[in-house]
């Protein structure tokens, strides 16, 4: 049976890179909340951002339900920063009898800082809407991250040396 893989980790740990790896190697479909948000909305939604992310996540979960029903694995590149967000995803798919596996991605802080620095440089020269994450924003977002418990984590992935 096809399954949903929920990626969890802080900014710049390699979730999107690992999602692309799974897409190639498992023939999975990747659904990204960031990609949907950037294609539909201005990069700054202010106080509406969290509610909009929740709605996008729900929409993509519905698409994932259909893809899994067709027999294809789905990788949710959502970040899944809080226990409540992860619980909501698991509850949704449990109600549809779809297995969910949580992959927690992490890396050394030095690797993460360098990835974010390089990503910001590349994005400043990119066309279209992008998320530039400066150091002060990164610290604020990191403070919101809730480490997943052992009970909710199916796979730990150290991406410090990830080169897929």
Where are these regions (language model features)?
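Conserved nucleotide-binding/hydrolysis micro-motifs of P-loop NTPases
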Residues: 35-37, 106-112, 163
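A glycine- and Lys/Arg-enriched "phosphate-lid" helix/loop adjacent to the NTP-binding pocket
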Residues: 95-146
